[in-house]
Amino acid sequence: MSRALSTLLLLSVLLPAVVGAREVRVEVRDPKGEPVADAVASLTPLEATPVVQPPAEPVSVVQEGEEFRPHVTAVVVGTRVTFPNRDAVQHHVFSVSRAKKFDLPLYRGEPREPVLFDQPGVVSLGCNIHDWMSAYIVVLATPYFARSGTDGAAVIGGIPPGRHRLEVWHPRARSALTREVVVAGGGAATQVIALTLGVDRRVRRAPDSAGGGYK
């Protein structure tokens, strides 16, 4: 996470915002109006406890080309995640995040067991061999979420009517944006968010990394 100042502003000034839809499209933009990818938008009901059902099969975060793919993954609490290594070299995946600490020593192919993510929060991933490899898993206690694509849009569907907490997170933002919205009916609605990101402080990839590392 960057220490640089990050400012998140909703273009709407009304709190709570009334959204006449059961589907919410969250459009994340930078101050110049350009789309922001890899933002996680979630809606948490405020009038009832959301029912969270983790998927039966593990979610995969792949190591390929000495990178984690995807860079940002959003899951619900209770999801198991596997970290297949498709590279010829070995990787050592780990996290020291409060929401999940784990360590997968040097391996190729499939690790023995998936990792269970049983607490909400943001989990930062790294590789002990390749310093530039980084990724994030956002663990949520709500089933209503989406990750923005290259167009900056995150579309959240199946939302029950009522008051919700909208939260938008990005790895280069100092903190997540939160606000209240009211989902009032059917159809679709759009929330536009202006997001200023801090400096990207990821370690640069080693120029001679291809084919290197531990065999």
Over which residues does each language-model region extend?
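Bacterial N-terminal signal peptides
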Residues: 6-16
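Generic extreme N-terminus detector
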Residues: 5-6, 25
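Extracytoplasmic copper-binding redox domains, predominantly the cupredoxin/blue-copper superfamily
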Residues: 21-215
